[in-house]
């Protein structure tokens, strides 16, 4: 069985291959998120504590948290759930997919582990070297949270602490820092005020246009009523004059 061991404190990751079943027995029948002592793997892992994060079987089916079985099951999954990508599906469509339970069994080919507690000896490639994080946070609120800043502090000066320096394709030394998103500046506030003013202007124009339309509609209806009353009055006068004429007898 292969072990993908990750060390979050150093940012390193390493793949180990262990074929001895006696060493692997400590991991059997354990579930995802359980912690396992690394003493059974050998002297070099003495004192280490690993946390199981997942794995895959020999056919490539991933383990799913919450499925309490060591074997494989077919579940009805929708888009957004683990073990189902769901690209190109219709909205709300569900598919029945094969997944493996969250209990570790000998059928697994890869098991993902995370070092929770460091042991006595250093593991080459995991604990002896440190890989710095290449990219820091980009959003202004997360930068404030990282450096414990207040609302009135300027975030832009703190981004330079994790500015990357590297050589581009032309062989020139350049530096790069993330573009801060959701940064509140006087220009953004001015744009916001302009948007609100434009919106208010549009609402006022719509209200005035609606009022003018109602006035025009009322005047047109009044003209229509006046014309109708005039035509009715003419009709009545014609009928009354025709009734008042004496009938001509032969």
Curated annotation (Swiss-Prot):
It comes from the Eukaryota. Residues 220-250 are annotated as: Disordered. InterPro entries: Ribosomal_eS6, Ribosomal_eS6-like. Ribosomal protein S6 is the major substrate of protein kinases in eukaryote ribosomes. GO terms for biological process: translation. GO terms for molecular function: mRNA binding; structural constituent of ribosome. Keywords: Phosphoprotein, Ribonucleoprotein, Ribosomal protein. Residues 239-250 have a biased composition (Low complexity). GO terms for cellular component: cytosolic ribosome; cytosolic small ribosomal subunit; nucleolus; plasma membrane; plasmodesma. Signal peptide: none annotated. The keyword Ribosomal protein applies. Residues 220-233 have a biased composition (Basic and acidic residues). The modification Phosphoserine is found at residues 237, 247. Component of the 40S small ribosomal subunit. Plays an important role in controlling cell growth and proliferation through the selective translation of particular classes of mRNA. Belongs to the eukaryotic ribosomal protein eS6 family. This is Small ribosomal subunit protein eS6z. It comes from Arabidopsis thaliana (Mouse-ear cress).
């Amino acid at each position: 069985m292969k072990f993908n061991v990750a060390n979050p404190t150093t940012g390193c990751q390493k793949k180990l291959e262990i074929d001895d079943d006696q060493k692997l027995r400590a991991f059997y029948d354990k579930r995802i998120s359980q912690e396992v002592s690394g003493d059974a793997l050998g002297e070099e892992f003495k004192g280490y504590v690993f946390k199981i994060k997942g794995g895959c079987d020999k056919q490539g089916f991933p383990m799913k948290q919450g499925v309490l079985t060591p074997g494989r099951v077919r579940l009805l999954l929708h888009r957004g759930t683990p073990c189902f990508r769901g690209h190109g599906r219709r909205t709300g469509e569900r598919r029945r997919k094969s997944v493996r339970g969250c209990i570790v069994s000998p059928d697994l080919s890869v098991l993902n582990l995370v070092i929770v507690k460091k042991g006595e000896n250093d593991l080459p490639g995991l604990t002896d070297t440190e890989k710095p994080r290449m990219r820091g946070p980009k959003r202004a609120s997360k930068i404030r949270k990282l450096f414990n800043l207040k609302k009135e502090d300027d975030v832009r000066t703190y981004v330079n602490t994790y500015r990357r320096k590297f050589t581009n394709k032309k062989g020139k030394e350049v530096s790069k820092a993330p573009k801060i998103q959701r940064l509140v500046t006087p220009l953004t506030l001015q744009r916001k005020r302009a948007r609100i003013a434009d919106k208010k202007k549009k609402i006022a124009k719509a209200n005035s246009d609606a009022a003018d339309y109602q006035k025009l509609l009322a005047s047109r209806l009044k003209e229509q009523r006046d014309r109708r009353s005039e035509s009715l009055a003419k009709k009545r006068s014609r009928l009354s004059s025709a009734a008042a004429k004496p009938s001509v007898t032969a």
